[in-house]
Swiss-Prot record:
GTP binds at D19, H20, G21, K22, S23, T24, N136, K137, I138, D139. Its EC number is 3.6.5.n1. One of its GO terms (cellular component) is plasma membrane. It is a peripheral membrane protein. This is Elongation factor 4. InterPro entries: EF-4, EFG_III/V, EFG_V-like, EFTu-like_2, G_TR_CS, LepA_C_sf, LepA_CTD, LepA_IV.
Amino acid sequence: MSSDPMRNIRNFSIIAHVDHGKSTLADRIIQLCGGLEAREMEAQVLDSNPIERERGITIKAQSVSLLYKAQDGQNYHLNLIDTPGHVDFSYEVSRSLAACEGALLVVDASQGVEAQSVANCYTAVEQGLEVVPILNKIDLPTADTERAKAEIEAVIGIDASEAVAVSAKTGLYVEQVLEAIVQRIPAPQPRDTEKLQALIIDSWFDNYLGVVSLVRVMQGEITPGAKLLVMSTGRSHPVDAVGVFTPKRKTLAKLTAGEVGWVTASIKDVHGAPVGDTLTLANDPAPKPLPGFQEVQPRVFAGLFPVDAEDYPDLREALEKLRLNDAALRFEPENSEAMGFGFRCGFLGMLHMEIVQERLEREYDLNLITTAPTVIYEVLKTDGTLVAMDNPAKMPPINQINEIREPIIRSNILTPPEYVGAVITLCEEKRGSQIGITYLGNQVQVAYELPMAEVVLDFFDKLKSVTRGYASLDYHFLRFQEGPFVRVDTLINGDRVDALSVIVHRHQAERRGRELCEKMKDLIPRQMFDVAIQAAIGSQIISRSTVKAMRKNVLAKCYGGDISRKKKLLEKQKEGKKRMKQIGRVEIPQEAFLAVLQIDNK
């Protein structure tokens, strides 16, 4: 390499909407640079988690260091940091981008620009990254590179005249991408301080090594034996080993400025290396941490309970291990009258929640019940205190509430023009208020303010169905807004089931209560006694349905004879049912808890 060790380093990310071929392009780049031999290559090398492969999405940021001999004859050190594309994982993207000097914006030439690419691209531009547009899937008959270029310029506003057109699947023109990386993405710049500063891009737990952190060294160097200080926690740890992924784990003597690699430092506590934090030397610390570290705020909350109460300690341990990989996952113990001990968990969105539940069940072999997800509400009490409420069961009594505020988000929806009407209708049904509509070439951008509670459940699915799958959605939190909200409780035989309580808009309360009762009637198995299902607001019952009892025909052995004999047997049966109803408990199946989700918010 040249005299300046950082001159030939290129740190870059790949940003794209879900399904535009980001992971496939990463595979081709690894193959071309000889990161893996042909026999070791497999599809989606960087998506190491089986759920990522099955769903075809990237959840966690991954990195790989490659050597590339460019056409100018020099050897370049390329560090690729893969990023997720789904709206739920936008913080993962911003951290990955903070570790780079450039980004490849991958756009499917047959589909054009979609909302998530726009959001991630704006993040990259705000952080001062050089964005190189890549048009992928040019081998498809429906690919239209000129239209895709025009959309990139119209929607995102960056110059696409030198966009590189490739087919990641076949490997066509991928070498031009590598040349564009070398020529257009700047080398890392030395910082004004000589002291060590390293950004933690990701952390995960390894049973043998403890916590492994993926870091970008901004300044200084990390060597085994040095004492590292984690700036947000104030704790220091001795470094065991450092290295890079090629994508196999490779140990090095040191990590120097500009490089991206892994560090192990015997950190056993899963909260010891928060993602987005800064590492520095304990005996010669940097004056201030790197900018941009923020605590991620969960937006969707749900209860997770083990089906078997004995699994509670295992669930706690599994959640603690998952939280290390997942900076956004929050949980606290919760006790439900209906389901015993479990945890109240906070997630970024519905996809995040599904993935966490799937990982718990798969990787830790747990059998779980999930309650219906809710968003966080603000409650202003009559004594002037403001409380955050993430669980409807914790809502204060009505006479203590001054007002309830719900979270409002701003959503940007990109859709083909023919579906604009359907999108507007859907947003209006969800109590949205329109901000504006912008026509951008072959796409229309519809901006709405929507209540988050309406979006988290099934908005995305409905948006896809009314636009035949063409629309894409990106959203961010705006503010809390007051509204007329009530809690609808579900009573089973007069007992309130706290896990089935929901907070709804007053105008929808009666319909939601009625639909919930009907749904529960189909899902609760018949007992030996009548089961009354009621929906109530406070003490006022707004709906009721009954699961009829199974009964034995006690008159089967009476042939003719006196009517009083039959009456006596029927009375005896009635008494037994009454007694049974007093002591009998109704087992509520998992499907009943998810019924709250399935009620169509028409």
